[in-house]
Amino acid sequence: MWMIVLFDLPVVTPEERKTASRFRKNLLDQGFHMSQYSVYYRLLPGKEALDGYIKDIKAQLPPKGKVDVLAITDKQYEDIVSFSGKTKEKNKKKPTQLLLF
C-alpha cells in the first residue's frame, strides 16, 4: 500500500514559508519521498500503518492551507503514468521487500 500526501500551503509571509518548510521536512523525516514540490509518497507495510501516519500528519498540520492524504494499492501505484517534459517515464515498480530472518 502507498500513501500520498498532497498539499497547498500559503507561503506569502516569512512565517508561512517557515511553517510550510517545517511540514515538508517532517514528511521527509517520516520516510516520505518528494514526487513534486507539494506531493510526497511512501510505501507502507500494510493498511494498518495508514492510521498511524495520518495521526502523525494531523499533529503537524499548519494552521492554514489544504492537505489531502490518499492511500492506493501497489497495483494502482504501478499503473501511474508519468511524463517528464514530453517524454513518458517508465512505469513505477514496487520496491522489493527485504526478508530478515
Describe the predicted segments one by one:
Residues W2-I4, P10-F101:
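Basic nucleic-acid-binding interfaces
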